[in-house]
């Protein structure tokens, strides 16, 4: 471990040390299916390297304990001082195309664009001025919280765009029961997904090659996509549909 980095840049290390005391490489080897010697070798290589970086995907985060998985990787990064220098740090890989761009644009219930917190009065005032309308100071609900609110009767209608919660929700049965309870469900999609079967209205959207747009990668590169194919049938770009509803 990097004692200097821990002392000057972190808190809670002693508590973490006590918490993991019983999780030796020998104890974890049968759980992980990796020999204890290999675990030790990888740990030493990571800690002693001039620059080590952790990249992880959905295998880490899409679990009931996904947040704790990520916290463990963050703790490993901090205790070894492998952060804040070229070639170090943490790099969570996004699960689908343009998740990064959507997040940057504010499609997260507790953030405005550029990750400005909804609860931040100064940030809210800036966006109220920019958009010319009052904004709710309370953060929205997460996908899981939304399904819970439907079961409680707090949400009676939903507009789902580019999402398939009947399959992707952590508890698909719970999500499907919620979708069936809704008084009105509008789904905007390019495919007839499982969620579409619960919809009262389906709005046909265009796929990637049928519209103009951008995709943002986690390396900060923004790729421009130009329409290459005509949209089939009545399909329209997502933004066009939203604008028509707003009018």
Question: Each predicted region: which residue ranges?
Answer:
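Cofactor-pocket helix-loop regions in the catalytic cores of large enzyme subunits
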Residues: 1-98, 121-247
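Long, low-complexity segments enriched in small/aliphatic residues
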Residues: 100-109, 126
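Conserved thiamine diphosphate
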Residues: 109-113, 165-166
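Extracytoplasmic/lumenal acceptor-recognition loop(s) of multi-pass membrane glycoenzymes
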Residues: 117-118
């Amino acid at each position: 471990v990097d004692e200097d980095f821990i002392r000057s840049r972190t808190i809670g290390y002693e508590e973490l040390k006590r918490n993991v005391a019983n999780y030796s490489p020998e104890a974890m080897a049968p759980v992980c299916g990796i020999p204890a010697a290999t675990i030790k070798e990888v740990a030493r290589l990571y800690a002693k390297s001039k620059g080590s970086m952790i990249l992880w995907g959905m295998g880490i985060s899409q679990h009931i304990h996904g947040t704790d998985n990520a916290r463990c990787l963050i703790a490993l990064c901090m205790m070894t001082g492998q952060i804040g220098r070229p070639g170090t740090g943490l790099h969570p890989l996004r699960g689908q195309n343009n998740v990064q761009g959507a997040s940057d644009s504010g499609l997260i219930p507790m953030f405005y664009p550029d990750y400005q917190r909804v609860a931040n009065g100064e940030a809210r005032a800036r966006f109220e001025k920019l958009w010319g309308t009052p904004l709710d100071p309370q953060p929205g609900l997460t996908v899981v919280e939304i399904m819970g609110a439907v079961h409680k009767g707090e949400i009676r209608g939903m507009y789902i765009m580019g999402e398939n919660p009947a399959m992707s929700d952590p508890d698909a049965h719970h999500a499907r029961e919620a979708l069936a309870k809704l008084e009105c469900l509008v789904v905007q999609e390019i495919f007839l997904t499982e969620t579409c079967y619960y919809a009262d209205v389906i709005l046909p959207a265009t796929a990637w090659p049928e519209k103009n747009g951008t995709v943002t990668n986690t390396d900060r590169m923004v790729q421009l996509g130009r329409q290459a194919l005509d949209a089939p049938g009545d399909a329209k770009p997502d933004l066009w549909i939203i604008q028509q509803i707003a009018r």
